[in-house]
Amino acid sequence: MRCGPLCRFLWLWPYLSYVEAVPIWRVQDDTKTLIKTIVTRISDISHMQSVSSKQRVTGLDFIPGLHPVLSLSKMDQTLAIYQQILTSLPSRNVIQISNDLENLRDLLHLLASSKSCPLPQARALETLESLGGVLEASLYSTEVVALSRLQGALQDMLRQLDLSPGC
C-alpha cells in the first residue's frame, strides 16, 4: 500500500495539533515586566528627573491623570490615549516607549480574553485635533507632562495588576 503525503500528514497530525497554551500567570508576569521597563525608560530620559505627575499646565488637560481603580478596559483606553499623544510628538525619546505601549496593550488584551471579557476597540481621542496648536506652543512641556503622567499611570496599573483587575 502506498501511503504518500497523506499518510505522512496523518502520522504527524497529533504532533501538529498539540499546542500548549501560555499560562495566564506568565502573561501577567510579562505585563508587569514590560510596565517596569517602560517606567525605567521614562526615568532614564534626562529632563524627566525632577517633574511631578501632578503638575498642571494650561492646555494639557486632555492628558489623563491618575485613576484610583483601573479595570482592564480603562487601562487599555488610557494607554491608547498616551500612545496617540506620544506618536504625535516629534521627539526621538518617545518612539520606543510608544512601541512598548502597543505591546503592553496587546498583553492587556490577552489578559482580558483570559477572563472572557474582550476589550472594546479604544476610541480615538477627539481632543487630539487641538494637539497641533499645543505642540507648537509648548512641545517640551507636552512631552514632560505626558511622560510624567504616563509614568504615574503605569505605576498605578502595576499595583492594580497585583489585585487582579476586572473587565
Curated annotation (Swiss-Prot):
InterPro entries: 4_helix_cytokine-like_core (IPR009079), Leptin (IPR000065). Pfam families: Leptin. Belongs to the leptin family. Keywords: Disulfide bond, Obesity, Secreted, Signal. Gene3D superfamilies: 1.20.1250.10. This is Leptin. Key player in the regulation of energy balance and body weight control. Once released into the circulation, has central and peripheral effects by binding LEPR, found in many tissues, which results in the activation of several major signaling pathways. In the hypothalamus, acts as an appetite-regulating factor that induces a decrease in food intake and an increase in energy consumption by inducing anorexinogenic factors and suppressing orexigenic neuropeptides, also regulates bone mass and secretion of hypothalamo-pituitary-adrenal hormones.
